[in-house]
UniProtKB/Swiss-Prot annotation:
First-level EC class: transferase
Single GO BP term: cobalamin biosynthetic process
Positions of transmembrane segments: 31-51, 55-75, 109-129, 135-155, 188-208
Keyword field: Cell inner membrane, Cell membrane, Cobalamin biosynthesis, Magnesium, Membrane, Transferase, Transmembrane, Transmembrane helix
Stated name of the protein: Adenosylcobinamide-GDP ribazoletransferase
Catalytic activity: alpha-ribazole + adenosylcob(III)inamide-GDP = adenosylcob(III)alamin + GMP + H(+); alpha-ribazole 5'-phosphate + adenosylcob(III)inamide-GDP = adenosylcob(III)alamin 5'-phosphate + GMP + H(+)
Pfam families: CobS
Cofactor dependency: Mg(2+)
GO MF, one annotated term: adenosylcobinamide-GDP ribazoletransferase activity
An annotated GO cellular component: plasma membrane
Pathway assigned to this chain's UniProt record: Cofactor biosynthesis; adenosylcobalamin biosynthesis; adenosylcobalamin from cob(II)yrinate a,c-diamide: step 7/7
Family assignment from sequence similarity: Belongs to the CobS family.
């Protein structure tokens, strides 16, 4: 179960302590557990949502969104911010885009992107609470983290060395495809037609975002993977809120 704990530690802010330095093979296998980490986070969000039952609507949604951000420690939002800055400031140039992603400072585009994404997510959460459609709180983390697995399965990793390269190089690809299939079936079982709609919208978004990564970078980075997760989570809650 070490790969699961690696995934839970890497993707979240829960107090997980590993027994030692993971081997590269264990890092690669941790990707197989990304969808399960999504289920864990989604279950925690569902529990917190139940605890907030009866709270004023806007406060309920704000606290739920705050918990959602805190669960991941803002890791993926950081990737989204870096990607937004790099995409605009890179002017279509691969090396310039990659260099901007390394810059820890956030520019105006990063700030605007984060505000827009969080505002839309907040509005969607309000709509889901009003319609008593809490399944989106489980589907969004599951689909978002499954998409990260899919990205590593089908997209080159462009930064040599480091954790991302170890994940990409040691991912058991055959098992990864089976995990994605199970995750897809789970979404349909959990949410029925709503799950199918969310999957279809996310498939289109995934294809478009991956196409942008391939055209600009020739692959993906940790930042673009985080951006993908955040945008697909948003796509899920918006889709369910609009149904």
């Amino acid at each position: 179960m070490l790969p699961f704990w690696i995934a839970l530690q890497f993707l979240g802010s829960l107090p997980i302590r590993l027994p030692g330095m993971p081997r590269p093979a264990e890092l690669g296998r941790s990707l197989l557990f990304y969808p399960l980490v999504g289920v864990v986070f989604g279950t925690l969000l569902l529990g917190f949502n139940a605890l907030l039952s009866g709270a004023p609507l806007l406060l309920h949604a704000a606290l739920l969104l705050s918990a959602w951000v805190l669960l991941s420690g803002g890791l993926h939002l950081d990737g989204l911010a870096d990607s937004a800055d790099a995409w605009l400031g890179g002017f279509g140039d691969r090396e310039r885009t990659l260099n901007i992603m390394k810059d820890p400072r956030s520019g105006p585009i990063a700030v605007v992107t984060l505000v827009v994404v969080l505002l839309l997510k907040f509005a969607a959460i309000v709509a889901l609470i009003e319609s008593h459609n809490s399944i989106g709180l489980l589907l969004a983390p599951l689909i978002g983290r499954s998409a990260m697995l899919a990205l590593f399965l089908g997209t080159p990793y462009v930064r040599s060395g480091g954790l991302g390269q170890a994940l990409a190089d040691h991912l058991p690809r055959s098992l990864g495809r089976k995990v994605l299939l199970v995750s897809t079936v789970a979404c349909v079982v959990l949410a029925g037609w709503s799950g199918i709609a969310a999957l279809l919208v996310c498939a289109v978004c995934f294809y478009w975002l991956r196409h942008m990564m391939m055209r600009r970078l020739g692959g993906s980075t940790g930042d673009t993977a985080g951006a993908l997760l955040e945008l697909l989570e948003l796509a899920v809650v918006l889709t369910l809120a609009l149904l």
